[in-house]
Structures are given as C-alpha cells and as structure tokens.
A protein has these predicted regions:
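Non-catalytic, conserved peripheral segments adjacent to functional cores
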Residues: 1-107, 123-125, 130-180
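Short beta-strand His + acidic residue motifs that chelate non-heme Fe in jelly-roll/DSBH
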Residues: 109, 117-122
Length: 180
C-alpha cells in the first residue's frame, strides 16, 4: 500500500496493493492495523454506498458536531473527489485537494474529521462507497456551496452539475460555521 500526503493536511491518497491473477484481482480495502499505522484513525462505525449518474455533484458536506472521518472510493465508474480543509487552526485552512478515484485506478482518499467532502461523477454511472468514523447526524450536517469562489475548487465540469436542492443552497464559505 502506498500512502501520499495531499495539499490538505491529513488528507491521504491511498494506493492499495492489488493482487491480480487470471481470475481477476484481490485487495484489502481496509484493514485496521495497516490503516491505523498509516494515520487513518478509526474506529469506523458506518459504511455508505451511493450511486450517481454522470454530472451529479454531491457536497460539500460536513458535520459541525460529530465530525466524520471518511475513507472513500469509487467501486464502479469514476469520480472527482474533493476534500476542503475547514479547520481554522490548520496550516491548509481553506485549501482543497481533488483526485480522480475510479474502479480502474482503485485509489482511495482518507478525509479526516474537520474537512468538508464532495465529489463529481465523471462516468455514466458511479458507485461510491465509504467508511465513516461517526454516525450520520442530520441535525449537525452542514453544506458549503460547491462553487464558492473563496475556495475555488477546480471541478472538471462539462456544463452545469446536477445537484440536490440542499446542495444548490449551500452556504458560502465566508458565512459557514467552521471548526476551531
Ligand atoms: C448521508 C446519509 C444520508 N441518509 C439519507 C438522507 C436522505 O434521505 C438520503 C440522501 O441523503 P443526502 O442527499 O445527504 O446524500 P449525499 O448527498 O450522498 O450525502 C453524502 O454526500 C457525500 C459527499 C458525503 O461526504 C457524505 O458524508 C454524505 O454527506 O439518504 C442516511 O440515511 N444516512 C446517511 O448517512
């Protein structure tokens, strides 16, 4: 497994070791001891799976209380996955990092608590699966506007994204409730 630090402190890009043979492939998509050693602190308490059509953009989401660390990957298709640093005390506060995660490159991203998260679906359809370190708490959920100019995420968009009503009404970064 290869682990790389990204432009956002604590956001890690993970390249698992793939064991391919004439049957297909095998890899350990999470393993407590190895991932803990790499700095991916658990424990994980919830697994999620979403499916999105091309052009669907979900995010930028975070929970102001019960913040979630997320270990994310695309198990079908491809997405452009983004983490935004929302920790005022962080050296990379306000910065974002974006990476293509796909069923072909099998990359994963570790998004620690304190970061916002979102993704854009690049393929006709994408299955997105992730482990979370805290339970979903809708009362604490917050959404920052996906195209906030102060953050300036470089989404690889071809036209307008498809958004939920909640995401279309995301809060500007400058007005958002953030972490200390
Ligand atoms: C996130 C979540 C949603 N739901 C429900 C609420 C709603 O009826 C439906 C769809 O919810 P949403 O529109 O919030 O789903 P979605 O936009 O996919 O939300 C997710 O976006 C990505 C970017 C993240 O980082 C995740 O943490 C999560 O916020 O699923 C749960 O039951 N549990 C959950 O953990």
């Amino acid at each position: 497994m290869k682990v790389s630090q990204t432009a956002v402190q604590g956001v890690l890009l993970i390249e698992p070791q793939i064991h391919g043979d004439d049957r297909g492939f095998f890899y350990e998509s999470w393993r407590q001891d190895v991932y803990a050693e790499a700095g991916i602190a658990g424990p994980f308490v919830q697994d999620n799976h979403s499916r999105s059509a091309k052009g669907v953009l979900r995010g930028i989401h975070y929970q102001i209380q019960q913040p979630q660390g997320k270990l994310v990957r695309a198990t079908r298709g491809a997405v452009f996955d983004v983490a935004v640093d929302l920790r005022r005390s962080s050296p990379s506060f306000g910065q974002w990092t974006g990476h293509e995660l796909s069923e072909d490159n099998r990359l994963m991203l570790w998004v620690p608590p304190g970061c916002g998260h979102g993704f854009l679906t690049l393929s006709d359809e994408a299955d997105f699966q992730y482990k979370c370190t805290a339970y979903y708490a809708p009362e604490h959920e917050r959404t920052i506007l996906w195209n906030d100019p102060d953050i300036g995420i470089g989404w690889p968009l071809d036209g307008d994204p498809s958004l939920s009503g909640k995401d279309a009404q995301g809060v500007p970064f400058a007005e958002a409730e953030l972490y200390p």
